[in-house]
Structures are given as C-alpha cells and as structure tokens.
Regions:
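Alpha-helix N-cap/start motif
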Residues: 41, 246-247
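Short amphipathic
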Residues: 32-35, 83-86, 224-231
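Short, charged/polar, Gly/Pro-enriched secondary-structure boundary elements
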Residues: 76-83
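Acyl-group handoff/entry surfaces in thioester-processing enzymes
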Residues: 2-75, 91-184, 205-209, 237-239
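Flexible, P/S/T/G-rich "lid" or insertion loops adjacent to the active sites of thioester-utilizing
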Residues: 17-26, 190-246
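Short, histidine-centered active-site or binding-site loop motifs used for metal coordination
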Residues: 86-88, 136, 233
Length: 247
C-alpha cells in the first residue's frame, strides 16, 4: 500500500452520506459529451486510457480501520481502453444510448461495491455522431476535476491526431492536495474564512420556493425529474430584456 491519506474537504460527508443511504449509485456523477463529425474512435479510446492514468485520484482506494477512513493510490492499477458500442442498427439509437447509460447507473456503484469507480464508454448513434459517456464516484472527482479530465483527454487525442507528443499531465498529485488542505485547515486564514461565512449564513433570507407546500419526505434517488414548459412568444419577449439587465 502507498501512503495513506485522510479524507478531506467534501469527502468525509460523501462517505458518511453513502454509508447512511441504501441507494446503489446516488454518489456517482456522470455525463455524456455529444461528438459530431468524423471521429477516430480507437484513437480516442487510447487517449481516454492514458488521460485517466494521468489523474492519480482515479486510482484511489478506500479502507476503514477502527472507524477511521483512509484513502490510498493503487500504483498497480491501470486503465484499459473503454468499450465502444455501435447502436446505429437500433430503431432509436439515441434512446438506446441513454438506456445503456441508465443501466450503468442502476448498478451498485458504492465505494465498497468492488465495481470500477471510474468508467467511460464511446457510443456511436450515427455515422458522424457519438456519445462519450463518463462516470465517476464523487469521492474521486468534483465539479472542477470532472471536466478537467475530459479536457486533458481531448488534448491528448488532438495531439496524437497531429503526431505531436502526448501532453504532460496538468494534474497536481493528490497527496499534495491533501497537504495543502491540511495546512490551510490549521491556518489563521481558515479561522477568518469560517467566521466570515458563518456571518453570511446568519444573514441569509429564508430559502426561496415556488411552492407553499413543504418538501416531501421522500428519500433521494439517482432518478432525474424533468418538466418542460413552453412560454408564449409575448411572455418571452418581456422576460428577455430583464434577463439581459441581470446577466
């Protein structure tokens, strides 16, 4: 085992929330990128494997000892090329692709499930239209690192297309991130920042809501609820100037 690191920032909350929940994948984060045009899918698949290897946080493993949770980077873990699915022969390739993604997210993807905590798939739905599906456990990535990994993989793919060398990893080793977090947590700046945000919280108004009824007591889920509304042209013309004034 390499250096053991404590959970930091949002990680302890994510770990505890998953332990308290019986949902199989509520703490997985996923999206897909639509790619239009000619694509060298085997080359992109190789770029995915190399780009994921450059981010050591994606090789993180977790263990709990005497009630304390530790994380460590598995030096032996290597990422293979993601699977490529061709759905052009399906009656509705778009919905078939979405079904593939939903099937992946319906698995038990908890941190202790033994399933891969990072997964990519390239899905072809037309001759020049692809979906690049990406899914991670939230312990591994946050809202910044998720798209940063995507951008690095895309940079590797573009470099290889022009026979340029593989771009170096832009990612800070996670051990350095933990060290910086711990230094900040022990600094006077952390005390000042905490006092500032505590005051901001005390001054916040009640949460805004479009409903007079309280929130229902249902448990959270990984399901997605969508509601689409069409605004009349006249109402939209009235709203547009107001939106521009507050942009």
């Amino acid at each position: 085992m390499t250096q053991r690191l404590p959970l930091v920032a949002a990680q302890p909350g994510i770990w505890m929330a998953e332990k308290l929940s019986d949902l199989p994948s509520a703490w997985s984060v996923a999206h897909y990128v639509e790619l239009n045009g000619e694509l060298d899918a085997p080359l992109l698949a190789k770029a995915v494997a190399v780009g994921m290897q450059q981010a050591d946080t994606l090789r993180m493993r977790f263990t709990e000892e005497n009630g304390e949770v530790w994380q460590w980077i598995d030096p032996e873990h290597t990422f293979g090329e993601p699977p490529i699915a061709d759905l052009r022969d399906q009656p509705d390739p778009h919905h078939a692709a979405l079904a593939l993604m939903q099937a992946d997210l319906r698995q038990n993807l908890r941190a202790d499930s033994g399933k891969p905590l990072a997964f990519h798939q390239l899905i072809r739905i037309d001759d020049t239209r692809w979906y690049w599906y990406q899914r991670y456990h939230h312990l591994l990535v946050d809202g910044f690192s998720f798209p940063a990994i995507t951008r690095q993989i895309a940079a590797i793919y573009r470099a290889w297309q022009s026979d340029a060398p593989t771009p170096e990893s832009p990612f800070t080793p996670f051990a350095d991130v933990v060290e910086e977090y711990q230094r900040y947590h022990q600094s006077e700046a952390w005390q000042r920042d905490g006092a500032f945000w505590a005051q901001q919280r005390r001054e916040l108004p009640p949460p805004a809501s479009m409903s007079a009824a309280p929130l229902p007591g249902r448990s959270a889920s990984a399901g997605i609820l969508r509601m689409k509304l069409s605004a009349p042209a006249g109402a939209f013309r009235q709203l547009a100037p107001a939106g521009g004034a507050h942009a």
